[in-house]
Amino acid sequence: MDPLEALQKHVQRPEEFPLREVTVSGISYVAFGDYAYKKDTETSLQIYGKSDEFYSLESLVVFLKYSHENHGVYVKEAAAAGVRAVTRIDRKNVTEYLQGDRTDFPALMNQVNPLSLRQLLHSSEPEAKKPRLDGEAAGEPMDTSTSDEPQESAVSAAKKEVEIRALNDNLTKDRIAEMRRKRQSHREKGIVTIDESLSTLTSASLPKTRIHKTRENVMLGARDLSNVLDIITSAQRQWDLNEKKEKVAAVHATNLSKDQSGAAGGQQQRSGYSRYAQEAFAHEKTKEIQTEGSFIGSNFSSIKQGHHAVQKAPDAPPGRPPLAKPIQLLTSSTATSSGSSAAQNGSKRTSRSPIIIVPSAMNTMINLYNVRDILQNFSYVPVDQRRKETNKKPVDLAIQRQKNGVTYNIRVIDNAEKLANDDWDRVIAVFVMGVAWQFKGWKWNGNPTDIFTHIPAFHFHVDQDKPVAQVMQWNVHKIPVSATKRHMDKARFSQVWETIENFVRKNKPHLTARLGL
């Protein structure tokens, strides 16, 4: 069998012809099953452009080992092994021949007869391990006569027992012979047939194996409890905030009681310095400048005493209108009283922040979990990933938009039913998921066509898939999002803000200041 043919059979049937490299008497051999060849044996594959040079068996074995790598890596490995590398031109032809796709290579080399691997390994054993079965070693003369049955004479000569001599009185020749026969019978009964290809198969598959359990991951649990640390951190932050509020409330209560006691007794005792009660002494630093007052009709003493000793201005002459009454500057104490009175009257501050509505479902590409990553950080993060990292779903979210070095807040909600009629005037964008029930309870009777006429709408979809069929019928901006190319997110999401800003300039100019336009 030609070495190239043996290598081809190994590629096609590796279990029947396993590859094995052995060294016998300092000579390296490549064995395919029981067929062994020297490593430097030349094959019938001719090198391209050189009619008198052929690839050696070792070169093809190295090529077969690194055939899955690119050509540059293979050339480095071949140079490290000290063999000739298969050229890039011959690479495809050699691969097709080894896989059996081509058989048209000319047989230019003489066929090399293989050696038996078992005989090579047997010949390499030391003399002490070889069984002495020949008659000459046993001291018996060899029969040199010719016979018609040489096979029977060889078998009979192999079956002759080795000369046995007694060692002592207890271990006689008969005793030693009996022990040898008993040992031989035990060996024959205990023989287990072992496939010689198992060792080669194990060595070939060892680089591809992966350790499933190690001493570290075997102690890991099946549940992911990493979010427990986030829960503890948020709870600790809330505890610190509550403790700080309690301290501030205690200081204010102490100062208030001291002020009341001082006013009742005609004396006011000033409390010690506290960093939590800075507002209690703010009225001492406030300058009561009466910008709309007048000094006409006042004397120097009244001016020096301030508004506590303001005297009644003299009556104006009949031909002159009365002077305007000086207005006191609003101090911290008056501001506090006015704020408390406003709170008692039930007045509520009206929000002026723009509003963006996102879907509330979990099977969408955008909702309250990842809207900050998309519209503020310009990076797409899947909803499931952000959901695992977040303790609970945010109810009302505020994202920040940087414009000309100024930060603007935009409110994001997923429940449009709680919006009043005035709030709908501040809605600047809607993100749709492709179903009509999303707009149930919305303004304009929940009609998607009317909603998209008054508010710009956007729909995110994977760039490899088409948008939902229902979305294709709506006036919606389709934004494709790549599943792997995160560097394209900023350009895609910037288009969303550009569309929103153009809409606000044209249709809602009262919100331009809220977006820095």
From Swiss-Prot:
The keyword Transcription appears for this protein: yes
Basic and acidic residues: compositionally biased ranges: 124-135
Keywords noted in UniProt: Activator, Nucleus, Transcription, Transcription regulation
Record GO terms (molecular function): RNA polymerase II complex binding
Keyword ATP-binding: no
Record localization: Nucleus
A GO term from the CC aspect: nucleus
Major localisation: nucleus
Record-linked Pfam families: CDC73_C (PF05179), CDC73_N (PF16050)
Family statement drawn from the similarity comment of this UniProt entry: Belongs to the CDC73 family.
Name of the protein described by the UniProt record: Cell division cycle protein 73
Species assigned in the record: Caenorhabditis elegans
